[in-house]
Amino acid sequence: MESAPKTVSLPVSPLGYVYARQKASLQTGTVSLTAARSVDSDLAVLPVIRGLTVEQTFTTNVAVVAGSKTTGLGGTGITLKLTPSHFNPSAFVFYGGSVIGASSNAPNLTRACEAARRRFGFSAFSSPPVENAVETSGEEICASLNLSPETTALYLVVTESFKEMVYVCNTFLHYGGTSTVTIDGQDAMKIPIYPVQLYMPDVNRLASEPFNAKHRSIGDEFVYSRPFFNSDLCRLLHGYVLGPAAVALRVRNLDGVARGAAHLALDENHEGSVLPQDVTFTLFDSTQGNAGKGSGRAQRQGDGSGSKNSASSGIERRLASVMAADTALSVDSIMGAGIYDTELPSVEDWPVLSSGDDTESLEALGAYAARLSGLVGAMVFSANSVLYMTEVDDGGPADGKDGSNPSYHRFYLIAAPYVAGNPQTDKDGRVLPHTADQQAAPINGSNQEFSLDYLALACGFCPQILARLLFYLERCDAGTFGGRNETDALRYLANTLESDVPCGLCNQATRPACAHTTLHRLRQRLPRFGAPVRAPIGIFGTMNSAYSDCDVLGNYASYGALKRPNDNEAPKSIMQDTYRATMERLVNELEQAKLIDKETLAQASPCSAPTSVVHDQASFIGLLSNIKDTIEGAAEQFMRTLVEARDFKIREGLADANHTMSISLDPYSSSFCPVTSFLARRTVFAVLQDLVLSQCHCLFYGQSVEGRNFRNQFQPVLRRRFLDMLNGGFITAKTVTVTVSDSGVLAPDLTRPASEPPTKDYDGDMARVSMEVLRDLRVKNRVLFSNGGANMSEAARARVAGMASAYRRPDKGSNILNGAVGFLVKQYHGVLFPRGHPPGIDTPNPQWFWTLLQRNQMPARLLSKEDIETITAIKRFSDEYSAINFINLTPNNIGELAQFYFANLVLKYCDHSQYFINGLTAIVVGSRRPRDPAAVLAWIDRTINGAADVEPAAQEVLQRLGSNPAAWTGTFTSTNMVRYVMDQRPMVVIGLSISKYNGSAGNNRVFQAGNWNGLNGGKNVCPLMAFDRTRRFVLACPRVGFTCEAGGFGTGVRENTLSEQVRGIVSEGGPMVQTAVFAAVLHALGARTQHLAVDDWIGLVDDEFLAASLDALNATVVDQFGEWSVEAAQELVKNMEAQTTAGAVAAGEGAFDFGACVGDTPQQSTSAFNGGLAMAAAPAGQKRSLPDDILFDMGAPPEKKSGLTFDML
């Protein structure tokens, strides 16, 4: 739903400021933990944060003085042109940056970036962007301000639209407008920056010769100021701003990108192309032209011709690539002029920094920064990440009877960094002579290993971004369970310490921190690229709204669905009957019963029931009964209200239900550090081009694309087609009207030198009065699996048929430990069955106990009457839940159990059958102090004396962790209470695929849907991810309480990793699961097993209780043998395995019949749900009578065999 137009009043502002601060006034600890700086350069990028880099009164949305124009009779008057914009979320330190700590100690990253730049053919910064440029050095600026160069740091804060203007030297410093502000209680000076176009009335274009003071465009009466050129600042902008944009847009001439973006800032009415005409393209064999890539579509064009049309296809692919890039740059300019509601973050409002004294605050900030390593690492480790979307492929026209019609899916982005070093061609496909000798890598990605060059390419060859990215990769520890000896970083470092490693970046002293050492440690997680396919893309973004529909049934029975047209009922009354409000009441009711704690639901913590609730077997049975009655009562009332009071079509509403969330396009929501801002911008470029590419075939259809003027002629058409897609289901936009809040415009007096004070005698004219502001990306996921429709194509039918088997619910009985109440059974096993452990072992063992029970191997003499009653209640509850369960997720706490149970009851009322629904899981990132010496190699800060000194040096780092606030590593925990995680307004990483389709008959508008999808890479991306088509994952890093106040998978290569091996052991079960798991991990990791923490064990087994027992085994080794060693651990395993079968029923001895321990038959237990709308509830476990006035016919219950058997094998 589009919002009503709003009016915003903006203050007039220069296009940017140069801040001058005393180095001693910088909060170097806080700044260093949020900055991006390479150890071999003093240049740095900082986040723009009030109280840290700018003053508390800093205004983000402004009307920029962008030029001048003549007015009045004879053109004798001057009016200033004003353009709306907002300030870029990053500040650029170009002088005195050495005071800021380096993000990583990895040496020579600038050299690494330049080597990758040369390999892939992107232009370097080697000379001023314009001719006859005169340097304005940092020392000169300090002298002009009467500041000491040795104690002063300078950085640029610039508006989003005009950052490229600074690079191309089309700006000047107005020293006369210098003002003093207060930042963190210290004085700072800031110099305003204005465009040189002020001196050139009526000129809406770049000045190609800004240093020509006698240019004819300069007004006769004006005193022209020297333009601002600082080589270090331009180098920094070249790397951080232009490099990532050039890689994302596939334009190797970075100056061309800068000039195009700068021109769009000056000419708001420009709709044509702005990228150079001589853009080059990467040579590779397109899917469309490659025989053997599937069916006949591989070589077929619209007219079915042969080689002639294959060449035409190559031209169309290259044309689609450059036109999509041009449109994306144009839309990025529109976004740069956008006005956003979110205020610039203030360091005083960060809860993470208010936890105590300075030391504690820095530790908290370092821990939070380490949390982000999970998200940033996912963007690096995922093969379909936007970081690697570097080429455009042509899938060819569609098959079938409509194959000749334009397709929205012909052109698409592919992840192919491995072909970036191929020869380059012009738009006609001719190889450029200076690249002809370069080796061409095949497009199928064979024999291509991930290297540092690819990482530098993903970073846009910016050493500052690469350093900060390594900052996060150095903290990626959880999940590295490859178990291969050659990946052990300690051994690699020891073996290579005294030899020459051909990386060209490090020496013996710097090798521990070298980027190649970090990549070697993580190389089993690095992405593997295969043949390009049209696939989802992995994106990074931020939830800036606390509202999402991520409960189990999504937006089922939402406010919009319940509200009747022309009904004057109060909105609050309608909201009370929605599914969302009902779930809130249910959770509140469980909290009042002291069964859950709402505060822990969003923390992905164990969320176990309080120990005071269960103190014996009777109280446990009462707990199960209480949970069951509460949930069934809430579901009954909810469905009765929908049917009787709301006349809601419950089955149709279920078919239309979606999980939904919104990712903000506000630049300040992702501005924690320069890398998060960089990832958000790369995401925007990828999403924009995905949408634009869908329209290219429609544009080319029936046209002669070989024409010289085709691109210039049709570029405005493509731009308009994209703008017509706004508010079409995916990208939302709002119309904003802007006005000027100041009566007079404060600007330099153009008739006097720049050292003179400004004047307020000018009038201002807003160039853009009304604009579209892009707000957010809408992501959705259907709750129900749809197995096809009448209008589906043959290819779609085949795809759905392949997925149906994954969604079909198997006909099998429940499993206790992996069932509805498995988490409660494991948590309270010691209370319920204190004797439930193998002989000779004093620790209660639920795996041993329930395995023997379900295999009918438990001696009946060991079970008391109370034990049997408890077992019966547990089995009955599990059976009843399993009979109606269509959610392919296992509850981990009472909150999840309540949500799943409630949703299953609703599904039952709606006659849902056969298929699982789509489930959501949030993987929440956390942090901890490292324990493994291999994880701290990058932080070794002393000289290593030989190979034998590597591990002692690492151990010294572990012993001094308390003195290093940045020494944390990332962890993962998962929860299925996704909405409560989304309430924390987190930064997220998800897979996204965008569907495009036309509306109803006669409607040619293109609608879109952002479909929640997966990340390629599976457990390499995150150890808690599973290849399961019925689940959708989101990686989340909460912001509430830290930096703000409360307010499917692709075809990646799958390996038999240790994690999969362990999961297989757990799924097979057995009386001593932890022994088998511990033995497998010990065999794979060896001595590293002793460093595994509970978080690591959870990452392996995805079971907190089993993880706790595994963690205790490490302590048991030390207790029994005095010290931990591999041999001692193996001896412990051997002793425990000897007791594995102990306690099982002996031959001829009576065994307890587990299958017969439930009084009611399965048919009776399931009928209790059919009678759920009865006015009176029967006692727990008894069949309920069906009332005569049932609301709707639920049909006969499914037939089940009278005896359910369980076999964990």
UniProtKB/Swiss-Prot annotation:
UniProt xrefs under Pfam families: Viral_DNA_bp
Keyword set, alphabetical order: DNA replication, DNA-binding, Host nucleus, Metal-binding, Zinc, Zinc-finger
Residue span of region Required for nuclear localization: 1182-1209
InterPro entries, sorted: DBP_sf (IPR035989), Viral_ssDBP_head (IPR043031), Viral_ssDNA-bd (IPR000635)
Annotated motif Required for filament formation, positions: 849-850
Any one of the GO CC terms: host cell nucleus
Listed GO biological process terms: DNA replication
Region (Disordered): 290-312
One MF term in the entry's GO annotations: single-stranded DNA binding
Metal-binding listed as a keyword: yes
Compartments where found: Host nucleus
Zinc finger (unnamed): 503-516
Oligomeric form and interacting partners: Homooligomers. Forms double-helical filaments necessary for the formation of replication compartments within the host nucleus. Interacts with the origin-binding protein. Interacts with the helicase primase complex; this interaction stimulates primer synthesis activity of the helicase-primase complex. Interacts with the DNA polymerase. Interacts with the alkaline exonuclease; this interaction increases its nuclease processivity.
Family recorded in the similarity comment: Belongs to the herpesviridae major DNA-binding protein family.
Function according to Swiss-Prot or TrEMBL: Plays several crucial roles in viral infection. Participates in the opening of the viral DNA origin to initiate replication by interacting with the origin-binding protein. May disrupt loops, hairpins and other secondary structures present on ssDNA to reduce and eliminate pausing of viral DNA polymerase at specific sites during elongation. Promotes viral DNA recombination by performing strand-transfer, characterized by the ability to transfer a DNA strand from a linear duplex to a complementary single-stranded DNA circle. Can also catalyze the renaturation of complementary single strands.
Protein name: Major DNA-binding protein
Organism expressing this protein natively: Equine herpesvirus 1 (strain V592) (EHV-1)
Gene designation per UniProt: DBP
